[in-house]
Amino acid sequence: MRFWWRLKKKVLKRWARDAFFPSWRITMLRWCGYQIGQDVYIADELIIAEELEDRGNLTLGDRVSIAPRVTLVLSSHPNDSRIRPVAPVARAPIIIEADAWLGTGVVVLPGVRIGRGAIVGSNSVVTKDVAPLNVVAGQPARTIRVLPTPPGWT
C-alpha cells in the first residue's frame, strides 16, 4: 500500500509543478495530503522536498501567495553517505499562515512557521520562524521591516 501512495504522490507533485492552471496545481497538491486554505496562489515550479511517505507536513493558510521556483524542504533527503550518522535526516512541518507572500526562488527549511501577513523577499533562505507582518530577506533571511497592522485585522 505504501508503494502505491508514494507513486501517486510523486506523480501528482510532478504534474502539479507544471499544471497549466493554478487551480489544478492546488487541487493536485491537496490530493497529496497537504492542507491548503482558500484563495491560495501557487505559481509554476514549486518544489516540495520530502520523503514521499510523509503526510500532512505542509500547511498553507488562506490567501497565501507563492511565486515561481519556491522550494519547501519538509525533510532532507536520506542517503547512504558515511556522514549520515552524524548528520541525520531533518524532518519537520512547514506552516505558512494566512496572507503571507513568498517571493521568487525562496527556500524554506524544515520546521519553519511563516507568520500571518509576512513577506519573504526573492531568493531568501528561511531557516527560522518569521513573525507576523515581518518583511524578511537574505541568506539566511532576516527582518528588514515590520509592517503596520492592516485595518480590520484582529
Describe every region a protein language model picked out.
Residues 1-34, 39, 63, 76-79, ...:
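Terminal amphipathic alpha-helical/low-complexity segments used for targeting or macromolecular assembly
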Residues 13-14, 49, 85, 103:
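A generic structural signal for short
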Residues 16-17, 52, 88:
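Residues that cap or flank secondary-structure elements
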Residues 80-81, 110:
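Short glycine/proline-enriched, acidic/aromatic patches that form the donor-sugar handling elements
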Residues 81-87:
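Flexible, solvent-exposed loop segments that connect beta-strands
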